[in-house]
Amino acid sequence: MSTVVVKGNVNGGVQQPRRRRRQSLRRRANRVQPVVMVTAPGQPRRRRRRRGGNRRSRRTGVPRGRGSSETFVFTKDNLVGNSQGSFTFGPSLSDCPAFKDGILKAYHEYKITSILLQFVSEASSTSSGSIAYELDPHCKVSSLQSYVNKFQITKGGAKTYQARMINGVEWHDSSEDQCRILWKGNGKSSDPAGSFRVTIRVALQNPK
């Protein structure tokens, strides 16, 4: 009976040498292809905008709740050639209830920064006469003292007063008047004259 010697080169039941196993692992690793990421041209990356920590710093103007600025318009109608009267700007301005009984009562202080006085003529071409007007910046005069400034009854006109002319630079307590405009006509009582249209700009602060 002859004996056959089998060397370790057969796969069945016999382990391969370590050198061959290393070579096979290297071959498998070489077969793996790297993945390449392709970015489409012409598409720039988006950059995130950094927002400031305090957005309120961008706001300008008067903060809410501290002050306000309003414009009021009122009229004085049915004037005749010899009409006379006055506008006292402040809590005594009965011709403008929205200002006197409205917003003025909601603040401790105010100042009227401009006044536009307009006379709208409704007189006929045959009427004669004029309406004189005068500014009293400190409410010291109760009747017209000057006849220098006038509106012709048949033509009308307008006059603008800025803050420095009407005592409107400093703040006033809401319980006191700021200034006054007086007016008086020298025409006939039977002649229709027209109407006044008054526009005021008011600044207010320190709400109640």
Curated annotation (Swiss-Prot):
Residues 17-30, 44-61 have a biased composition (Basic residues). InterPro entries: Luteo_coat, Viral_coat. Major capsid protein that self-assembles to form an icosahedral capsid with a T=3 symmetry, about 23 nm in diameter, and consisting of 180 capsid proteins monomers. Most of the 180 monomers are the major capsid protein, but a small percentage contain the minor capsid protein, which has a long C-terminal extension. The lineage of its organism: Viruses, Riboviria, Orthornavirae, Pisuviricota, Pisoniviricetes. Pfam families: Luteo_coat. Belongs to the luteoviruses capsid protein family. It is found in: Virion. GO terms for cellular component: T=3 icosahedral viral capsid. Its main location: virion. The N-terminus like those of many plant virus capsid proteins is highly basic. These regions may be involved in protein-RNA interaction. Keywords: Capsid protein, T=3 icosahedral capsid protein, Virion. One of its GO terms (molecular function) is structural molecule activity. Residues 1-69 are annotated as: Disordered. This is Major capsid protein. Residues 1-16 have a biased composition (Low complexity).
